[in-house]
Design a protein with these regions (language model features):
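Long, low-complexity intrinsically disordered regions
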Residues: 100-126
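Thiol-based oxidoreductase modules, predominantly thioredoxin-like and allied folds used
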Residues: 30-54
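Metallocofactor- and cofactor-centric catalytic cores in central/energy metabolism, strongly enriched
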Residues: 118-183
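Short active-site neighborhood of thiol/selenol oxidoreductases, capturing the structured segment around
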Residues: 2-24
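Residue-level signal for short, function-critical loop segments
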Residues: 11-13, 39, 74
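Non-catalytic, surface beta->alpha helical segment in thiol-disulfide oxidoreductase systems
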Residues: 63-64, 69-104
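Catalytic cores of nucleotide-enabled group-transfer and carboxylate-activating enzymes in metabolic
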Residues: 3-4, 27-29, 37, 68, ...
Length: 183
């Protein structure tokens, strides 16, 4: 056993992740490991940490599950994605992982990189740089109707500028999020 610690990111809705439950049990018994679950707080082990908000997955820049991250001296020293027995054994220092399992299997796409999710997570947990004031819209009020009532349309349909839409638009321009373009 090494002085390394590990973080494992999984989701129940991934055949590779569900196949590897015996491996997670082996690792938990022999290594300091934190298991983050993206979709089911009861999976894969009782010690798993609920990451349904995907905040930790976002900050860890997870693209595929399972992802096993190794830390040494408090900093990430490596990561592996998917399942390849020999690679996991070398990476963790634990031999004979998952003896009855197939030797290799690719992982699945992580929930935090699903279409539309990257923008939502960037606005929620990242540094979007946006400082514009938000206009509160009563939940009983239709934001499109409100835009028409305030004269924010030339008669064409209006798409309310949600933070996600604004962030996505800013990715296609050289404008800074705090730049004033009109008054």
């Amino acid at each position: 056993m090494s002085d390394a610690t590990f973080t494992l990111v999984v989701k129940r809705d991934c055949p590779t992740c569900t196949m590897l439950v015996p491996v997670y049990e082996q690792l938990e018994a022999s290594q300091p490991i934190k298991i983050l679950t993206q979709d089911d707080p009861t999976f894969p082990l009782p010690s798993a940490i609920d990451d349904r908000s995907l905040e930790q997955s976002f900050h860890l820049d997870i693209e595929t599950v399972p992802t096993l991250i190794k830390y040494a001296d408090g900093s990430e020293s490596g990561r592996i994605v998917g399942w390849h027995r020999e690679e996991w054994e070398t990476f963790t220092g634990v031999s004979d992982l998952g003896p009855g399992l197939m030797p290799a299997k690719p992982g699945c796409g992580a929930l935090n990189v699903m279409p539309g999710m990257a923008e939502r997570l960037q606005v929620r947990f990242g540094d979007s740089g946006m400082i514009a004031r938000e206009i509160d819209v009563n939940e009983l009020t239709d934001p499109v109707e409100m835009a028409f009532e305030r004269g924010w349309s030339d008669g064409l349909p209006v798409v309310p500028p949600t933070p996600e839409r604004v962030w996505r638009m800013l990715q296609g321009t050289s404008r800074k999020p705090d730049e004033i373009v009109g008054i």
